[in-house]
Amino acid sequence: MQKEWLERTLLESDADFRVLISPNCIVGPDPSHGTVFKYPGGGADSHGDLGFGHEGREFRKWVHDKKLTNFITINGDRHWQYHSVDPESGLREFCCGAVTDSHSVKKEKYDPKYHRFLRLKGGFISVALDGTRQDPRLTVRIHDVEGKTVFESQVERT
């Protein structure tokens, strides 16, 4: 029911940009889970890894098939910061990371197939809508824990 609601709402939206804020990653990649973390479930807890990977692939394929080019996801339940693009669907994802540097994972590896940015520290994300009504731009900034911008990406309406 939730999935159908989300898909219908995204398709019916006439917004210049669609942003899904999720508690876990949909793109990832999320390879460090499983052996690094020792808690029930083994850490396979997202749509970007084996936990819910089949649902993640299904949703990313749906995004691609529906040509939702002005759609991004933002998540915060990874312990590193990143901007990734799914190589098959083109879905863009941003992760704010842990709220402190001390809670960051130090073993994540840059994956050029997905990552456009990877930082093994904490911080937060800000999003701004800039430009004009005729030429809007969504700017996503990833900040360190002190507020300094460490990465910036613009999403243009297509």
Predicted regions and their residues:
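Long, structured stretches of catalytic cores involved in phosphate-ester chemistry, encompassing
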Residues: M1-T158
